[in-house]
Regions:
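Small-residue-enriched hydrophobic alpha-helices in membranes
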Residues: 2-124, 140-231
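Primarily EF-hand calcium-binding motifs
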Residues: 127-129
Length: 231
């Protein structure tokens, strides 16, 4: 049985070990799997986003769930107070916000839609976002799965990641994971951190996801500001 806390923290802040260092030839975000673990977590080599690598480093000592929930909570507070989206600040000036215990932003105590664990929903969202700009053929998928087999995950966790990577991209299914507006904000923010939207397909994916999550008007800009603050 998958341990949601372990999988989530392994992805965002665990000590993954993997041979590598040479390019795998895989495209886009998924191709960085072969470059080795970065940011202290497994998701660094799986995804191409510089933001998520730095997020993994920031999550060390706090836990990825707490930091992600805190960033979404800060965005929600600023949006609710009708503040202008805050520009990114230098790391020394940027405190790590943490959500109140058992609040709607506390991923460790919340369930996703259908009763699943909210942390698993976030991992699914990040993997889906990584596929937004890629078309993986059968040979590339086999190479990617071989690399996943070398990661520090147990059998069920590897199977989960492989299954999520193999699924067709379905933004509606990802949006349906959110049980609350607060979870919708966290899912969008996690998806944003998983990619650097410099490709029109990535930007279109995030826009579509925001619409399907029914994020309140103006909130996305605040979530984007928090993503920009992860430096």
């Amino acid at each position: 049985m998958i341990d949601p806390k372990k999988l989530f923290e392994d992805f965002l802040g665990g000590g993954a070990k993997q041979p590598g260092g040479k390019a795998s030839g895989l495209p886009g975000n998924l191709g960085t799997l072969a470059t080795g673990a970065v940011g202290g977590g497994l998701i660094g080599p799986l995804l191409g986003s510089k933001k998520v690598r730095k997020f993994g480093g920031k999550a060390l000592g706090y836990g990825g769930a707490a930091v992600l929930g805190g960033l979404a909570y800060k965005a929600w507070q600023d949006w609710s107070a009708k503040r202008a989206p805050a520009p990114a600040q230098p790391p020394a000036q940027q405190p790590i916000p943490l959500p109140p215990p058992r609040s709607p932003f506390d991923l460790e105590t919340q369930s996703a839609a259908g009763g699943g664990d909210a942390r698993i929903a976030v991992v699914r969202a990040m993997i889906a976002a990584a596929k937004a700009d890629d078309h993986i053929d059968a040979a590339e998928q086999r190479a990617l799965f071989d690399r996943i087999g070398q990661l520090d995950l147990d059998t069920e966790e590897k199977a989960f990641v492989m299954d999520e990577l193999a699924k067709p991209l379905d933004v509606a299914a990802i949006a349906a994971l959110a049980a609350t507006p607060e979870q919708a904000a966290e899912i969008w923010l996690a998806s944003r951190l998983a990619i650097d939207p410099d490709d029109p397909r990535e930007k279109a994916y995030l826009d579509d996801l925001a619409a399907r999550l029914k994020l309140p008007e103006g909130l996305t800009a605040h979530l984007e500001a928090q993503a920009a603050a992860v430096v």
